[in-house]
Amino acid sequence: MKKFGKYSLIICGLLLFTAGTKAQQINNFTVQQAVDYAKKNSVHVKNALLDVLIQKQVNRDITSIALPQINGSAGVTYNIDIPVQTIPNFISPATYKVLIDEGVKNGNGQTITYPAGGFGNLLFPFGTPWVASAGVTLSQIVFDGQVFIALKARNGTISLQERIAELTEENIKANVYKVYYQLVVGKTQIELLDANLNRLEKLKHDVQIIYDNGFVEKIDIDKLSVQIANLQTEKLKANNMIKNGYSGLKLLMGMPIKDSLVLADKLDENQVKEGMLEASQFKYSDRKDFQISTVTNVLNGLNLRRYKLSQIPTFALVGGYSKQAQRTEFNFFNKGDWFTSSYIGLQMRVPIFNGFALQAKKQQARLQLQKTQNQTEALKISIDGEVENSKNNFIAAIATMDFQKKNMALAEKVYDQTKKKYEIGTGSATEINTAQLDLKTAQTNYISALYDAIIAKVDFLKATGKL
C-alpha cells in the first residue's frame, strides 16, 4: 500500500510536469511568421474581421426586404359577451297590418289597432361564443427606390469593412516589424556590450600584470573596474528592456505571455537597404486609407441617390388567404363549416408632403458627400507629404547607418592601437580610457542608427502602401 502511494505521487508529478510542458509553447518565429501569427491572433484584427462578417449579415437583412414577406396567423376567441345590434322592429308592423285588415279582435272583443307607443326595436346578437381563424398574408415589393439603392450598396459596404480590416492588419504588421527588429537590435547591443566587457576584462588582466611589475598605479586598475561595473549595469538594464519588449511583442501579436518566443531573424544591413522605391512607383490606390476614402465617397453618393429616389411612388403586391369557423361550443375539431376568404391586390404609395423632411435629408447627404470628397483631396496631399518625408528619412537613415558602421570600425581600430601602445608603455591610461569611451559611443550611435534605419524603412513602405 505504501509502495502504491509512492508510485502514485511519482505518476502525478510526471503528469503535472507534462501538462506544464504542453501549456508553455515555444515559438521560433521569423518576422514574417510573427506578422502571420498576429494577423490570426490579434484581438484588433479578429474584431475587424468580425465586422466584415457582421456587415454580411446586415446585408442579408437588407436583402430580405426585397424578398416576399409571408406571415401566418391563427387564433381562437371566446366571446364572453356577444355584441348585440339594435334595429327598428320591421316585423310587428306587418303583422298588425294583416290583423287590422282582417278585422281581428282581441280577447276583450275589441278590434286590434296599432299600439300607441310604437313597435320599439329588435335586438340581434351577432356572432357565436366561439370563433376560430387561421390564415396567411403575402407582400412583395415590386418597386421601391430606396430598397433598390440599398441592394446596390451591399458590395460597397462589404468592401469598406474589408478595407478597414486590411488597414488594421497593416497597422499591426508595422508595429510588429518595429518591435521585432527593436528586439533584434537589442540582441546586437547585448553582443556589443559583451564584446566590450571581454575587452575590458582582458585589458584589466593585462594592466594587472603591468601593475604587478610596478609600471602602473592601482588607480588604473580601479578605473577599469568602474568601467566594467558600468557596462555590467548597462547590460542588466538592456536585458530588462529586452524582456519587457518580448512581453510587449507577445501582447501585440495576441500570444500568451507564458509562451516562449524566439526571434529567428538576424539583422541584415543589405535587407534594410532593399525597397528604396522611386516616387514614380507610388500610387494613391496602394494606400488602404485612400481605398477606404474612395469607397466612402461611393457609398455617400448612393445615399444621396437614395433620397432622390424616395420621391418616386412605390409599388407592392399584397395577398391573403384565411379560414374562419364559428361555433356555439368548442368543437372545432369536429365536422363543421369553415368559411374561406382571400384577396390579392396591388398597392401604390405616393409621397406627397412630409414637412420638407426629405429636402433636408437630401441636403444633408449632398453636404456629407462634399465633405468626404474634400477629405479625399486632403488625404492625397497628406499622402504626398508622408511619402516625401519618409523617403527622405529613409535615405538619410541608410546614409547615417553606413557612416556609423564605418565610424564604429574606426573606433575599434583606434582602441586596439591605443591598447597596444599602452601595453608597451608608450600610451597613457587617459588615452586608453578615451579610446574605450569613443568606441562605446560609436557602438551606441551605430545601434541607434541601425534601428532608425529599420523604422524609416517600415514608415516608407507603409507610406507608399507597399508594406
What is each PLM-predicted segment?
Residues 2-3, 57-59, 163-165, 169-284, ...:
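Periplasmic alpha-helical coiled-coil/stalk elements that build and connect Gram-negative outer-membrane
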Residues 23-84, 257, 263-301, 352:
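Bacterial Sec-pathway N-terminal export signals of envelope proteins
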Residues 25-26, 73-136, 266-274, 318-350:
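Small/polar, glycine/serine/threonine/aspartate-rich low-complexity segments that form flexible
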